[in-house]
Structures are given as C-alpha cells and as structure tokens.
Amino acid sequence: MLMPRYYPLFLDLSRAKCLVVGAGAVGRRKIGALLESGVRELVVLDPELSDPALLPEHTALVFKARRFTPEDLAGCALVFAASGSRETNAAVAAACAERGIFCNCADAPLEGTCIVPATARAGEMTLALSTGGASPAYARHLREALEGWLHEKMPLTTLLGRIRPRLLALEMDTLQNTDLLRALVQSELGTALAAKDAKHCHELLAAALPKGLHPWIAEFLDGLV
C-alpha cells in the first residue's frame, strides 16, 4: 500500500482535549510530549498499568484504569492508540475515523490519520522531520544530526524575533518587510553573531534596517554578542 502524502502541521493544544490509550513505554512517551506541549486536558486509559506513579504528576492529566470505549472520544481533538493490543488499537483508530478525529496508531500507522515526526528544538525554533512512515529510525537519526545545526542558528532566530514586531509596527508594505527579513537571513549576520562581532552586527543592521529602527539596534543585539 502506498504511504499517504502527509500534510505538515504544528498544533496548538492549549485549548484541546487529547486521549492516549495505553500507558506502556510508547504511551508514556506520547504523554510526556503532549504535556510538554501544554495540552489543556489529557485523558489516559490503561486497565493494565500496575503503578499509576509511573505517570507524571500534572494537573492536565486524568488517568482511568479501564478499557477504551467509543464514548471516551467525546470532545477529543487528537487521539493516540498506543496500547499493547492490536485489537484495541484497531478499535480506537476505527472509532476515530468514524468521528473525524485525528488519530495516531502506534503499531499500524496507516490505520490512523496522522504520524508524529521526529523533532529537534532550539529555543523557539522547532524542526519536524518525517520519512513518511518509511523509516522512523532514520528520521530520528537525521533529527540528532540536525540538533547541533539548529542550536547554531538560535542567535539569528532570536534576533529576527526581536526585529519583526518592531518592523511590522512601522506599517511598511508587506513585500518590503519580507524582502528585508530575507536579506537579513541571507546576509553575514548569522556569521557575525556566531563570532560575537558586535561591531559588524551593528553595521549590518544599520545598513539593512529602516532608520526608524536604528534606536533599537542595541536592544535587538542585547545578550547575543
């Protein structure tokens, strides 16, 4: 069977209810990632979990030591079928499909409607990588290789994050803003930041930014050089 052509997407779960069916090693990884993402409510079902203390203590987490029923899907935006039972996971995925709820099925990705990419994070920057389900192990390998690269780019990401709101406040043409930010990305600014060359960074910004932002240059660079 051909793998789906997945649509990449980042989700804000701060107002969402999610469900994880199964609290084994795989399920606990899903639980940890969901809590880290700030999910509003996370229901975990597992009738066989011997020690609930294995789950993290969190106000958003609700654990129920029982089997899955379709009624558990009420209000859920995202569901993970991560039990050790093929039958249970298939039932969860099928029930989600009937209700149009996104479901990640750990042991049979094609039964679900979404997969979880390998992710690398550095500050506010997140890189998500997938092989389309062909080789999650290789995706993880690539993620590890890219983590160092991401950390090298953090100073420039932070700087651009400081500049952008001030730039937008000038109410210039959208295309002008885009061209200016792209020019900064393609300039020597990243190299100058990595070298902690404050003078060169200041010169590059003064040459590229509108005069209305020049008084902010020192603040933009604060702590980065």
Residue ranges and their predicted role:
Residues 46, 63-67, 107:
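Short loop/edge segments at beta-strand edges and connector loops
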Residues 56, 61, 92-96:
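A generic structural signal for well-ordered alpha-helical segments
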Residues 1-55:
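Hydrophobic, well-ordered beta-alpha structural blocks that scaffold small-molecule cofactor pockets
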Residues 78-85, 89-116:
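ADP-ribose/adenylate-binding Rossmann-like module
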Residues 25-26, 87, 133:
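Residue-level detector of alpha-helix initiation sites
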Residues 17, 77-78:
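Structural motif
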Residues 57-74:
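Glycine-rich, highly charged phosphate/nucleotide-binding loops
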Residues 133-225:
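An accessory alpha-helical subdomain
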